[in-house]
C-alpha cells in the first residue's frame, strides 16, 4: 500500500440516505427482513474501507506507471491484485453504463447550446408555449 494511507476513516463516510436506498432495494419491505441501524453503520464502514483499499492500490499502480491520473485499468488491476477479480465484469459493465450516461448528458447540453439561444430566451419561449397551450385549453368547447 501507499505511504499516504489514511490515519483514520472516521472523517470518511457515505451518505446514509444512499446506503439506506441500496439496502431497501436489496431487502424490499415485502421480504419481512429489516436492517438495523448498527448493521447499516457497519456496512457503511466496510464500504469506506473497501473503497480506500481499492483506491490506494489503484493509486500505487498508477504511480508505478508514472501516471498522474488513476484510470479504469488501474482499478481493474487493483481488484485483480487484491483478490476481487470476480467483481471485474460487473465493474466494467457499470463503468460502460456510466460512460453512456455521460454521452447522453453531453448530447442534451449540446442541443441547448446549438439552439443559439440563451437560457433566458429559452425560458421565455417555454413560458410563451405554456401560455398558448393554456389559452387553447381554456378556449376549447366543452
UniProtKB/Swiss-Prot annotation:
It is found in: Nucleus. Forms the NCT transcriptional regulatory complex with nctA and mot1. It comes from Aspergillus fumigatus (strain ATCC MYA-4609 / CBS 101355 / FGSC A1100 / Af293). Disruption phenotype: Leads to a multidrug-resistance phenotype, including the azoles (itraconazole, voriconazole and posaconazole), as well as the salvage therapeutic amphotericin B and terbinafine, an agent used in the treatment of chronic and allergic disease. Also leads to transcriptional derepression of cdr1B and its over-production. Also results in a notable increase in the immunogenic properties of Aspergillus fumigatus, but does not result in loss of virulence. Gene3D superfamilies: Histone, subunit A. Belongs to the NC2 beta/DR1 family. This is NCT transcriptional regulatory complex subunit B. GO terms for cellular component: negative cofactor 2 complex. One of its GO terms (molecular function) is protein heterodimerization activity. Pfam families: CBFD_NFYB_HMF. It comes from the Eukaryota. Keywords: DNA-binding, Nucleus, Transcription, Transcription regulation. Part of the NCT transcriptional regulatory complex that acts as a key regulator of ergosterol biosynthesis and the azole exporter cdr1B. The NCT complex binds the promoters of genes linked to azole susceptibility, and especially represses the expression of cdr1B transporter. GO terms for biological process: cellular response to heat; negative regulation of RNA polymerase II transcription preinitiation complex assembly; negative regulation of transcription by RNA polymerase III; positive regulation of transcription by RNA polymerase II; RNA polymerase II preinitiation complex assembly. Its main location: nucleus.
Amino acid at each position: 500500500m501507499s505511504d499516504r494511507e489514511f490515519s483514520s476513516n472516521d472523517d470518511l463516510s457515505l451518505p446514509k440516505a444512499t446506503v439506506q436506498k441500496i439496502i431497501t432495494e436489496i431487502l424490499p419491505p415485502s421480504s419481512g427482513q429489516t436492517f438495523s441501524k448498527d448493521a447499516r453503520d457497519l456496512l457503511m464502514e466496510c464500504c469506506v474501507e473497501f473503497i480506500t483499499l481499492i483506491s490506494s492500490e489503484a493509486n500505487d499502480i498508477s504511480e508505478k506507471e508514472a501516471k498522474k491520473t488513476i484510470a479504469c485499468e488501474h482499478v481493474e488491476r487493483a481488484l485483480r491484485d487484491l483478490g476481487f477479480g470476480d467483481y471485474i465484469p460487473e465493474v466494467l459493465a457499470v463503468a460502460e453504463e456510466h460512460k453512456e450516461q455521460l454521452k447522453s448528458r453531453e448530447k442534451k447540453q449540446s442541443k441547448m447550446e446549438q439552439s443559439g439561444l440563451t437560457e433566458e430566451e429559452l425560458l421565455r419561449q417555454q413560458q410563451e408555449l405554456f401560455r398558448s397551450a393554456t389559452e387553447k385549453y381554456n378556449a376549447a368547447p366543452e
